[in-house]
Amino acid sequence: MGFPRLWAALLRAWGRWTARPGPRVPGLPPMAGNKVPPALPSHQPDRKGRGGWVWEETEHPAKRVKGGEDEEPPRKLPKRKIVLLMAYSGKGYHGMQRNLGSSQFRTIEDDLVSALVQAGCIPENHGTDMRKMSFQRCARTDKGVSAAGQVVSLKVWLIDDILDKINSHLPSHIRILGLKRVTGGFNSKNKCDARTYCYMLPTFAFAHKDRDVQDESYRLSAETLQQVNRLLGCYKGTHNFHNFTSQKGPREPSARRYILEMYCEEPFVREGLEFAVIKVKGQSFMMHQIRKMVGLVVAIVKGYAPESVLERSWGEEKVDVPKAPGLGLVLERVHFEKYNQRFGSDGLHEPLDWAQEEGKVTAFKEQYIYPTIVSTERDERSMAQWLNTLPIHNFSGTALGADDTGAKVPSSLEGSEGDGDTD
């Protein structure tokens, strides 16, 4: 076909196509017959990027988020799993653990969660449902019990100056002393290998009953301190502690607990009264266990109970074991040795040893925990009152209802449930 004939064919085709009725829309096929074409949109689309047409936003204005035209959308910070090192004086609190729906009983976690929300670390709804931030504490310290090294794990937004902002919303007797990143599945209670508690008491508790002294003049002798440490050392190892709690029977496997160490430190004087601190480290403790361990040693040293009662208390028979007052019990620190061995040197996570925070821990104890124990002991004399109940106990035979034998001493700091990190 020559060029003239090809050109004529193209002109004829063009004439037939342009003669069809109705407006044409680029990109749409021509309309057949006299059908009315679809109406075009009343606005012109905005072309964005390469290819495709993006239509203008048609959402009703009332549904749009209010704000300036140039306002940027809110940032979404990723949540990170962390642990917080806490110290607190438990006076006036009903323990560590939060009890939702029971606002009349104020707990340490009530104040902590409120501070986390106000600081902008967690959303407000996480405060009412703590599972949303995977919250867990190492130990449930009880009513009036203090802590110098409590550790909690949770997910938060890692905002700038996070420790300062949290502490700014906490009372002075509750402090966050440290923060570390941990693995995503970390659970502070389950990953804790051991817990160390201390029990601070006036040394006149060890004065023999035949020359009992309950005033500021008593000073603990080196011989008596040696006897105390010999008896406390008997607790080391694995024993059946069913007589040291009201929760377990003699044949329950969970009544067997492993004690790594227990000893009494050198005495010191506060406000004219001599005190000593007993430290105990164990894998875990049952309700009232530490207070009963201290109570039985005091009863032996004072001459109310024979030393043989220790061996008997680990047998299946029921033994009358006195429970020392809750005042003086402090959660000293928690240990994560297996976690540190696995993750502490992997280059991604820090070991949970808190060595750098040791100075702050000591300062907090000296400023808030020890003064509270000393002043309360002087005002309420809880140890002196409890010592007067020791003659009531029967240490020679099988105990029946021994837990209720007039040994309860009321105190604003007495732990309602004892040592707190029960199963």
Curated annotation (Swiss-Prot):
Q: What is its EC number?
A: 5.4.99.-, 5.4.99.12
Q: From the UniProt annotation, give the residues forming the signal peptide.
A: none
Which biological process, per GO, is one annotated for this protein? Answer: positive regulation of transcription by RNA polymerase II
| Active site residues according to the UniProt entry | 142 (nucleophile)
Q: Give the superkingdom in one word.
A: Eukaryota
Task: Give an example GO molecular function.
Answer: transcription coactivator activity
**Quaternary structure, from the entry:** Monomer. Forms a complex with RARG and the SRA1 RNA in the nucleus.
Q: What is this protein called?
A: Pseudouridylate synthase 1 homolog
Q: Which organism is it from?
A: Rattus norvegicus
